[in-house]
Amino acid sequence: MEKFNIHILGCGSALPTTRHQATSQVLNIREKLFMIDCGEGAQVQLRRAKLKFSRLNHIFISHLHGDHCFGLMGLISTFGMLERTADLHIHAHADLQRLLEPQLEFFCKGMPYQVVFHPFNPGERTVIYDDRSVSVETIPLRHRLPTCGFLFREKPTPNHIRRDMIDFYRSEERRVGK
């Protein structure tokens, strides 16, 4: 079975405590990391969990309360200092791009990688990410702000069947049977 597990980096409310960090989870699907929310302190928790920063390429933000997104700028900046070159994809309400772009322009100018925004409407159920391993769908939720959950659907791995080997063993089977 392929790897599919979740790391809870934080599950606290809007006020982190000494025992609970702000909201952030990382889903590991076949060694690709997907972050769901990025509360303050998420990058420290990533290090504690011994998760490789280089495998994190997609961040999904459920809504625009600070405890779900205040860790983004620090993480983006750290990736720049680590000389990351792979693009970082942020999937969130369109307003997040409007909020982050001035900060990126001021603090992160000249980074060796791009931050790519993928805005979505949290009030609509839609597929917002799809590759050969997984698809991600938004699920609208009730909250004080437009909010959604994320449904990660793992896709089956293709069978590793070689036609030439099937033909070879079938011909052997025919010879043995005669």
Regions found by a protein language model. Give the residues of each.
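Active-site neighborhood of divalent metal-dependent phosphoester bond hydrolases
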Residues: 84-88, 93-121
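Conserved beta-strand hairpin/beta-sheet module of binuclear metal-dependent hydrolase folds
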Residues: 1-49, 87, 150-152, 159
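Short, charge-rich binding segments
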Residues: 51-52, 80-84, 108-109, 129, ...
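Generic structural signal for residues in well-ordered beta-strands
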Residues: 6, 115-117, 136
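Metal-dependent phosphodiesterase/nuclease catalytic metal-binding core
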Residues: 121-178
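Alpha-helix N-cap/helix-start and coil->helix boundary motif
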Residues: 43, 53, 66, 97, ...
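Structured loop/turn residues at beta-strand edges in well-structured enzyme cores
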Residues: 51-54, 113, 132-134
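Active-site metal-binding motif and surrounding structural segment of the metallo-beta-lactamase
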Residues: 40-91, 119-121
